[in-house]
A protein has these predicted regions:
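Conserved phosphoryl-transfer catalytic core
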Residues: 230-231, 235-251
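The conserved Walker
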Residues: 50
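Short basic/glycine-enriched coil/helix segment immediately N-terminal to the Walker B
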Residues: 185-195, 211-223
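Conserved pre-motif I regulatory segment
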Residues: 2-46
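Walker A/P-loop NTP-binding motif
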Residues: 35-36, 55-68, 85-89
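Residues immediately C-terminal
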Residues: 78, 204, 232-235
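A substrate-engagement module of RecA-like helicase motors
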Residues: 2-17, 67-197, 202
Length: 251
């Protein structure tokens, strides 16, 4: 197995695979520290300046490790970028055979049952919603993942989205007639089988809050968890675990 020096040196694996790659001492040192933390199941906080190349510095050690790792990003856009661009790049450079998976929250996946429910529903009289529903139905016949993010023409706040996605409250689970074809179920199965799972902070802490209730969790257990943009964690975590008191309650 390659060492960190084999990966990040001037004649290393990244330099050989990525045009214009320039070794940076801070990047190599960070990668070594991340590798050490993973190998010893330790904790590590890294503050890296702009241009350090921190993404490669944590992806390479994760790919070189034997256990399952979760990588969490600050936003869904960064999650997409990491999974579709950075991770394949480093994986190819290392010649890694590790399995990877992208996992998003439930509302990001098409619900086949709800699409069927609302198809032909005469109560959907507004042209905008009907047009969006037709667009979703056309896309549903070709998508492999059911990830609503694939539908670039659909606005993020499209009014049809609550009609074609599910929530914890309205999901039928194993009682759903489309359970075996459910895109959310498929995404979780892929995550269970993967070595590297890419999530985002909101999903991570929402899932942790669900774990506290004893059901409904999506993210599998892992040997290592890596948070990118970790400075966002206090605000996001407090949304799910914080308590607030008013002055009236205190008195």
């Amino acid at each position: 197995m390659p060492t960190i020096n084999n990966v990040f040196s001037s004649d290393g694996l990244l330099a050989g695979a990525i045009k214009g790659f320039v070794p940076r001492e801070a990047q190599t040192e960070m990668a070594k520290a991340v590798k050490r933390a993973i190998d010893t199941t330790g904790s590590l906080i890294v503050e890296a300046g702009t241009g350090t190349g921190k993404t490669f510095a944590y992806l390479a050690p994760a790919l070189l490790s034997d256990g399952k790792a979760i990588v969490s990003t600050g936003t869904k856009n960064l999650q997409e970028q990491l999974f579709h661009r950075d991770l394949p790049l480093v994986k190819k450079a290392l010649g890694s055979k590790r399995k990877t998976a992208l996992l998003k929250g439930r509302s990001n996946y098409l619900c086949l049952h709800r699409v069927a429910q609302h198809s032909g529903n005469s109560t959907l009289v507004e042209k905008e919603v009907l047009g969006q529903l037709s667009e979703v139905k056309r896309w549903s016949s070709t998508t492999k993942t059911g990830d609503m993010g694939e539908l670039k023409t659909l606005p993020e706040d499209a009014r049809v989205l609550p009609l074609v996605t599910s929530t914890v409250d309205n999901c039928l689970g194993r009682d759903c007639p489309d359970y075996e074809d459910c895109y959310l179920v498929k995404a979780r199965r892929k995550a269970l089988d993967a070595d590297i799972i890419v999530v985002n902070h909101h999903l991570f802490f929402a899932d942790m809050a669900l774990k506290d209730t004893g059901f409904g969790e999506l993210i599998p257990e892992a040997d290592a968890i890596i948070f990118d943009e970790a400075h966002q964690i206090p605000d996001i975590a407090s949304d799910y675990f914080g308590e607030s008191l008013s002055t009236r309650q205190i008195h």
